[in-house]
């Protein structure tokens, strides 16, 4: 489910436009929501990590190598090389917070379930329950794999060395 993009366990950041539409970064795309309804998706121009923000109703997307400036529909207006990755690093640092019209929005995690909360306490987005269940399932699987690996290492170390002793006749 994760490989197909149907379940998302982490986000690449978020931003809002002047109409308070939510832009939520996922794997290789930015989904645009209006009041919890998905409107459309914008291509992130990479299948790897990226960072983005919205300034003056334009999306700035940094792939650490290239910066794309797009309109709110995702049409590329301009692009340039980010040779020192400074914009990428700055956007990554600020990916869990966004300010618009004097209000601050923050990405919070409640037991691993992401949600975006306005400074007045209003939740404007929460990770879907299916995605959260998949995320918990992955964490439990990883924990079981670690326990299994430790068990196997311990059990192989405890095996006695069996050596053949010949009796002299």
Q: What residue ranges belong to the model's regions?
A:
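Eukaryotic scaffold repeat domains enriched in small/polar residues
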Residues: 1-169
């Amino acid at each position: 489910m994760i490989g197909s993009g149907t379940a998302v366990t982490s986000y690449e950041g978020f931003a809002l436009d002047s109409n308070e539409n939510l832009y939520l970064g996922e794997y290789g795309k930015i989904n645009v929501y209006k009041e919890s309804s998905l409107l459309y998706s914008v291509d992130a121009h990479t299948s790897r990590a990226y960072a983005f923000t919205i300034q003056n109703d334009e999306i700035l997307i940094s792939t650490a190598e290239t910066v794309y400036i797009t309109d709110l529909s995702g049409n590329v207006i301009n692009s340039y090389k980010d040779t020192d990755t400074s914009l990428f690093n700055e956007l990554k640092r600020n990916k869990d917070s966004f300010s618009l019209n004097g209000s601050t929005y923050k990405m919070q995690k409640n037991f691993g379930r992401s949600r975006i909360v306005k400074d007045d306490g209003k939740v404007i987005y929460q990770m879907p329950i299916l995605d959260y269940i998949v995320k918990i399932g992955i964490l439990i699987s990883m924990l079981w794999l670690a326990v299994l690996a430790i068990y196997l290492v311990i059990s192989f170390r405890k095996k006695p060395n069996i050596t053949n002793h010949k009796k002299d006749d």
